[in-house]
A protein has these predicted regions:
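Short, well-ordered secondary-structure "scaffold" segments embedded in the functional core
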Residues: 1-180
Length: 180
């Protein structure tokens, strides 16, 4: 499977979901995200180009963990030659192509802006897929279930989304006794 995926440039993005505040003070500190001003889980999704399928999902990581750290911890799942597209949160990673960042006190020229626009048009599909996962209320709002079940719930919902986009086609079972 890894060799087949190297033909594609996969798209990667991360997002946070608010969770119940842990009782333990040390856990509270680990899960507190200053960005969201709440205790959060962080998840990362990797999809095929043109929104064809969800390739990989990492769920239930600590909220304040950076996107690039999350990617670096899990990149051994893919071939060393695999290429990715990501947003500015992934700047500095050799395997991930990112948009051109504006320099301090300088504007981007027209070619750079056009390049970023084309890049964003190709990368927007991962945002659409994250939105289709967040349609489910359990992922959209505060996660109130047991925190140990977060990954299981997240993977189940991703399976339902794959079924909805017809990326996961189950074989049709036929009953041995038919009326015809």
């Amino acid at each position: 499977v890894k060799e087949v995926l190297t033909e594609y440039e996969l798209t990667v993005d991360s997002y946070e979901q608010v969770r119940e505040r842990p009782m333990d003070n040390e856990l509270q500190e680990k899960y507190y995200s200053g960005k969201k001003s709440n205790h959060t889980f962080k998840s990362q999704m990797i999809i095929l180009p043109d929104d064809q399928d969800i390739v990989d999902v990492i769920a239930g990581e600590l909220g304040p963990k950076s996107d690039i750290t999350l990617f670096r911890e899990n990149r051994e799942r893919f071939d060393a030659k695999q290429k990715f597209k990501g947003d500015l949160a992934y700047v500095g990673e050799d395997l991930i192509e990112t948009p051109i960042k504006k320099q301090k006190k300088r504007e981007l020229n027209i070619e750079q802006k056009e390049s970023n626009k084309k890049f964003s048009q190709a990368r927007i599909f991962v945002e659409h897929r994250i939105h289709s996962v967040k349609i489910f209320r359990v992922i959209q709002e505060r996660f109130r279930l047991n925190s140990k079940k977060y990954e299981q719930v997240m993977l189940t919902i991703c399976g339902l989304v794959r079924l909805r986009i017809k990326a996961l086609i189950l074989p049709e079972k036929r009953h041995p006794i038919s009326l015809f």
